[in-house]
Amino acid sequence: RRQRQMCIRDSPIPPFTTSTLQQEASRKLGFSAYKTMRVAQKLYEGINLNKETSGLITYMRTDGVQISQEAITNIREFISNEYGKNFIPESPRYYKSKAANAQEAHEAIRPTNFTYSPKLISKYLDKDQLKLYDLIWKRTLSSQMASAELDKTTVDIKSKDNSITFRTNGSQIAFPGFLKVYKESFDEKTTSSDNDDDKLLPILNLNESLDLKKLEDEQHFTQPPARYTDASLVKKMEELGIGRPSTYASTLRVLVERDYVIKESGKLIPEERGRILTAFLSNFFGKYVDYEFTATLEKDLDKISDGKLPYKDLLSDFWRDFKKHLDKMTDLE
């Protein structure tokens, strides 16, 4: 028995910023943040296409989600020609960053020429370049496509003798829209839940006969928070206002290179050296490793960049307090 509960519209997400590119490349491609930026740098600087060097993507250090009007026009035209007019919304989509400290000085990361599809230029790219370019190309394309229409559905499956009923909740695609091209990945859930409404279900007919292939009995428990990955740590840094698009990858790289953390199966695990350093800084320099202090300092640096705050004032205020902490350290044995 299939029961349709409601039809919902699922809208596409914005094109990539530096942080979202690093997160999605980590989830979908298994790239570290550093590797993502290294490959993106090459795509930005230019690839030799038939004896002509062309930059394939826009600047890859950005917190902006907006793209130029010319690019939007070209993308909408491409979608209409490739998928049909019902796959483009009536009006172009415009996005604005939700990050508190976003400067949006640059466009989102997008292909510079949408006629250069991944398939068309695949022979000019190495394996990693093609994977990342394909990710950027599809994400940008999907950001200007029509919303997907999903039927929230409950399906009951009964045994032949009607003694057992299995129930599952999920969605069935009524109209794919942007899902025709791209679906976002997510970090692993930190808790178990019976709520599987996000699951995509196949189209089933009333009284359709199904074959049981496998039956598993599972017991779920509440799980502790998952360890950070490159993707989830970059996301957390952005939420806390720590760092900039230009520093996310290098920050994570330093943690590994200095043996503060190690990577196991993509998870970042603190090493003894990292734990000792954290304990020392928290005890003696707690103010300076506080998330709020770092976020506030980032905002002050923005004010200096905009000419709203003299840099000497910031340095003077910082050093006056910091020196007091340093002087206290000289008394430690």
PLM regions with names:
Residues 3-8:
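Short, small-residue-biased leader/transition segments that mark boundaries at the very start
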Residues 9-14, 23-32, 57-67:
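Conserved short loop/turn motifs at secondary-structure junctions
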Residues 33, 55, 63-333:
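Basic, low-complexity terminal or inter-domain segments flanking catalytic cores
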